[in-house]
Amino acid sequence: MNVQSPVRPQYRAVFISDTHLGTRGCRTDFLAHFLGRMSCEHLFLVGDIIDGWRLRKSWYWDPAHDEVVRLVLRHARRGTKVTYVPGNHDEMFRAWLPLGLELGGVRLRPEAAHTTATGLRLLVVHGDQFDSVVRCAPYLAVLGDGAYRASLVLNRWFNLARRHLGHPYWSLSAWLKRRVKEAVKAVARFEAALAGEARRRGFDGVVCGHIHHAEMRRVDGVLYLNAGDWVESCTALVEHHDGRLELLDWPALNGFSFLAPRPQAVPQTA
């Protein structure tokens, strides 16, 4: 009798953040494509997965958002250890953290720790706790959120034009953010704060999200890893079975040359 060995998951660990389900900006097409094709032992949802800020203001949830949730739960059912670390946009889940709940096999945690195959100890946090605007002046963060959403509208029209010209998806809003002097300074402060916290607590590195800026580099001797987002860049951080860490640019890896059409929103009552 031949007994087949279980298929080894593609990755040892996968980290995704800032999907912002519940907004029109969420790239559910790219995200579902990724979740449906990868497999992993550990899946970390590093905050701002569901955008409670936007859902409180106006309800938007189409079938593509349901599909993303279904795919995450399918990973949990198939044995993937799924850990959800809420951020500031899904802070409603933080009230449940003291209960240590599991929802559909998804563990809710205020933060997490992950040890790679090579022995690196990584702190996993969303990162809003280290953003001075969110921490000290949350009303400014909300105002900034409005300006950010406006940039995403511009980004979508820009990419529609690129689609008609036969060019691949490219994030204009992310490109602008990397070149605005004050934004660059804010990113540097954020990175230094996260790296400092990881060092203070004895970790070798930190995995975060929050600023929608995928990055993998050393900051003052600490490995700083930002998983990016699924609104602008559509990136994920993965750990291979040999412990190697890699940032995946999903649209670029798959040669997406157009934006998939979006289904019409299903009217919902708030």
Predicted regions and their residues:
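Anionic group-transfer/hydrolysis microenvironments
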Residues: 19-20, 50, 128, 251
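C-terminal regulatory/interaction regions
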Residues: 250-270
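Active-site-proximal loop/helix segment associated with metal-binding centers of metalloenzymes
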Residues: 125-190
